[in-house]
């Protein structure tokens, strides 16, 4: 292996390792210290495919890479190009074919209703979204998402504001709770429930359903059912004269302005048959004690700490500026990511030499099929990335590349990666000798203490 090629491999692996305090980063010769020239120009050279924040640095991507490429002469969408710099100028390591793994809610159709709206990302918008579907919903103060149920289970994360949820369990137990930003709810398939915005600006949340074919327009609605049931039957069911039901809606209400709710205690039905549910349908995700990493924080919610959530597991990540969610993969489910804040790039390795890099920003959805290796790198040196990793699974599972190599016999690792350079192999194995998992790795400064291999 030639020295420049060896150094590309060596320094690339080191950048992804982002060592703990006691570890020393791998170093390389100063002549390969970093990229040369202005990004996206014919003279730009970067043998290591470093990140470029086109949006933050106000750069216009062009398909130039290490002496290859040419300018663009035809029609262009410059805003989209800035949002997707790694599609315009892919890293040299990208190769082969891969279906699209990115969708923006900004491209989804919005259904506008009285005091609210909804939009969705399903397998119809993003064909790789096979296991999960997402719905972004907004309810103003007092606005109700009417009483309904689904074929699928519903998991939700509150993005802003406060919301009141109601639900009924299979034992006839009632659940009512007021939730706020950073909290979750989960309704098992078929369980009836409702939602209502509470705070002055209402609420906005992300809904997740455990089937990529889900459609928000195909839910079972109270008003829709009664509008399509003979009033004589309704009267018999509720033991009330048919005339009482002449005032009910003739079609579904779906999202509508409701009356102002009182306190939960004031709203509890007073009938003798009322009982509280023994199930906990809500969870305070952001109140969890975080997993602290060198480059951020992680909170994991699954059936181990939110028992009712049998089909959806999730991780909330805060990735600090310049930091990276380490190279890893998930063995039990596809990853469905929702980016809440910041800008990031993700390279997905699909085996057989196939890899592709996608860029994400707030409001984007990303898919990584199960077992495909990937990372999430914060493109910005100033702004954190906040992202949800969501899975159709009862438990969150992942494998860390760093931990795997750190706990594999050193001889085996060196035989795989550094057979032609024992010195490089020694440096690498020293860097991974503490195999403790570091889920989000802080940015490493490779400009210090340069050494020749």
Where are these regions (language model features)?
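Glycine- and acidic-residue-biased ligand/ion/polar-headgroup-sensing regions
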Residues: 141-144, 149-171, 321-324, 329-352, ...
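Ligand-binding loop in jelly-roll beta-barrel domains
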Residues: 19-23, 180-181, 186-216, 334, ...
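A short, N-terminal "cap"/entry segment at the start of jelly-roll beta-barrel domains
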Residues: 18-133, 233-316, 320, 326, ...
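Fungal secretory targeting signals
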Residues: 1-21
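Intrinsically disordered, low-complexity regions enriched in proline, serine, glycine
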Residues: 147-149, 166-168, 175-176, 207, ...
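Active-site-adjacent segment of 2-oxoglutarate/Fe(II) JmjC oxygenases
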Residues: 202-261, 384-441
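Structural signal for hydrophobic/aromatic residues that build the beta-strand cores
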Residues: 139, 158-165, 182-187, 195, ...
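Short acidic-glycine-tyrosine-enriched beta hairpin
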Residues: 129, 139, 155, 169-190, ...
């Amino acid at each position: 292996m030639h020295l420049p090629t060896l150094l590309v491999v060596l320094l690339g692996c080191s950048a992804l390792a982002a060592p703990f305090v006691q570890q020393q980063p791998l170093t390389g010769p100063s002549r390969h210290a970093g990229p040369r020239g202005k990004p996206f120009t014919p003279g730009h050279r970067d043998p290591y495919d470093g990140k470029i924040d086109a949006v933050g640095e106000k750069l216009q991507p062009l398909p130039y890479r290490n002496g290859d490429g040419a300018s663009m002469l035809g029609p262009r969408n410059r805003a989209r190009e800035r949002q997707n710099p790694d599609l315009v100028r892919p890293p040299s390591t990208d190769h082969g074919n891969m279906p699209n793994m990115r969708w923006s809610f900004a491209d989804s159709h919005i259904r506008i209703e009285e005091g609210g709206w909804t939009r969705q990302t399903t397998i119809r918008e993003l064909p790789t979204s096979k296991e999960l579907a997402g719905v972004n919903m907004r309810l103003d103060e007092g606005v109700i998402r009417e009483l309904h149920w689904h074929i699928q289970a519903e998991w939700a994360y509150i993005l802003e504001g406060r919301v009141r949820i109601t639900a009924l369990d299979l034992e006839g137990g009632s659940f009512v709770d007021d939730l706020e930003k950073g909290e979750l709810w989960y309704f098992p398939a078929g369980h009836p429930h409702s939602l209502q915005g509470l705070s002055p600006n209402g609420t906005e949340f992300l809904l997740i359903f455990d089937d990529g074919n889900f459609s928000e327009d195909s839910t079972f609605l109270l008003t829709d059912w009664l509008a399509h049931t003979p009033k004589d039957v309704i009267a018999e069911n509720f033991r009330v004269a048919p005339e009482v039901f002449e005032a009910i809606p003739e079609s579904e209400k779906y999202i509508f302005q409701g009356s102002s709710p009182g306190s939960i205690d004031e709203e509890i039905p007073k009938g003798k048959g009322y009982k509280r549910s023994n199930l906990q349908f809500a969870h305070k995700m952001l109140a969890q004690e975080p997993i602290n990493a060198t480059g951020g924080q992680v909170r994991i919610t699954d059936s181990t700490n939110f028992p009712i959530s049998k089909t959806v597991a999730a991780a909330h990540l805060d990735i600090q500026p310049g930091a990276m969610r380490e190279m890893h993969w998930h063995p039990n489910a596809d990853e469905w990511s929702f980016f809440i804040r910041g800008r990031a790039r993700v390279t997905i390795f699909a085996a057989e030499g196939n890899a592709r890099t996608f860029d994400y920003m707030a409001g984007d959805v990303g898919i990584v099929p199960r077992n495909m290796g990937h990372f999430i790198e914060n493109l910005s040196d100033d702004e954190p990335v906040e992202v949800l990793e969501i899975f159709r699974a009862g438990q969150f599972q992942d494998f860390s590349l760093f931990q795997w190599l750190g706990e594999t016999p050193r001889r085996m690792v060196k035989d795989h990666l550094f057979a032609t350079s024992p010195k490089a192999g020694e440096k690498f194995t020293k860097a991974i000798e503490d195999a403790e998992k570091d889920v989000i790795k802080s940015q490493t400064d490779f400009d210090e203490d340069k050494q020749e291999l």
